[in-house]
Amino acid sequence: MNIQDMILTLQKHWSSQGCVLMQAYDVEKGAGTMSPYTFLRSIGPEPWKVAYVEPSRRPADGRYGENPNRLYQHHQFQVIIKPSPDNIQELYLDSLRALGIDPLEHDIRFVEDNWENPSLGCAGLGWEVWLDGMEITQFTYFQQVGGLECKPVSVEITYGIERLASYIQDKENVFDLEWTSGFTVKDLFMMAEYEHSVYTFETSDVDMLFQLFSTYEKEAIKQMDNGLVHPAYDYVLKCSHTFNLLDAKGAISVTERTGYIARVRNLARKVAKTYYEEREKLGFPMLKGEGSSHE
């Protein structure tokens, strides 16, 4: 099964469980969890079901396209359901069956791996899912998002698309994976992998990136003061990505690193609080099954 068919299969499976199929969010981020479809929607009491593919950029993992297992940008298939259903593990195993992986014929283990994202003030109880010795999925019950306690608890399922495809297609090099008929990962992403690695490690302007971080930080605070959650959160994401670029370049010392992470976390917490307050003003409309002109 190629990657495109894998994605279509997962979309069909989770759509049948009532998930909204969203498209990837158009601001750089290091993980699918950082999308507003997860970060913001996990806050507050309103129910939510979503599934989407998220390209995830991790500048420090760039290897000029020369490493068979490390990528500047990989893809995650993200599922969020709030409140978490009692049969979520069985629904997940059903998704593996849909991909042609029979749990009865494979060694599938849920290995405890509690999760934390310090820069977003997020934490949860969770497991890595191992398939015949390879991690393919992260399974997390959110306890805290943006420093706020999660009531009710959301469950997040994150499939590593390239990793799962490596198993399904029995390929050792990620660039050899078939994306769809006639196209490999190498065809689609090798040039970008190489160029982003050159940019990250060689040609990026450190002074400009430091300036951008401060500019994005100020704008995030300004828009929160205006009660505009989504524009503010976009700038939090931009702060996070800019920090990751600086960190990958080695421009931030160990001592400074803690301070920068704290600055991003403080922004994320303010956004979370503002989002909750704005939804509360609207009367948490999705509790009533109503839409909102502010969506």
UniProtKB/Swiss-Prot annotation:
It holds the Pfam family tRNA-synt_2e. Its main location: cytoplasm. GO terms for molecular function: ATP binding; catalytic activity, acting on a protein; glycine-tRNA ligase activity; transferase activity. SUPFAM superfamilies: Class II aaRS and biotin synthetases (SSF55681). NCBIfam families: glyQ (TIGR00388), PRK09348.1 (NF006827). Belongs to the class-II aminoacyl-tRNA synthetase family. Tetramer of two alpha and two beta subunits. One of its GO terms (cellular component) is cytoplasm. PANTHER family: GLYCINE--TRNA LIGASE, CHLOROPLASTIC_MITOCHONDRIAL 2, GLYCYL-TRNA SYNTHETASE. Signal peptide: none annotated. GO terms for biological process: glycyl-tRNA aminoacylation. The lineage of its organism: Bacteria, Bacillati, Bacillota, Bacilli, Bacillales. InterPro entries: aa-tRNA-synth_II/BPL/LPL (IPR045864), Gly-tRNA-synth_heterodimer (IPR006194), Gly-tRNA_ligase_asu (IPR002310). It is found in: Cytoplasm. It comes from the Bacteria. This is Glycine--tRNA ligase alpha subunit. Keywords: Aminoacyl-tRNA synthetase, ATP-binding, Cytoplasm, Ligase, Nucleotide-binding, Protein biosynthesis. It catalyses: tRNA(Gly) + glycine + ATP = glycyl-tRNA(Gly) + AMP + diphosphate. The keyword Nucleotide-binding applies. Its EC number is 6.1.1.14. Transmembrane segments: none annotated. Coiled coil: none annotated. It comes from Bacillus subtilis (strain 168).
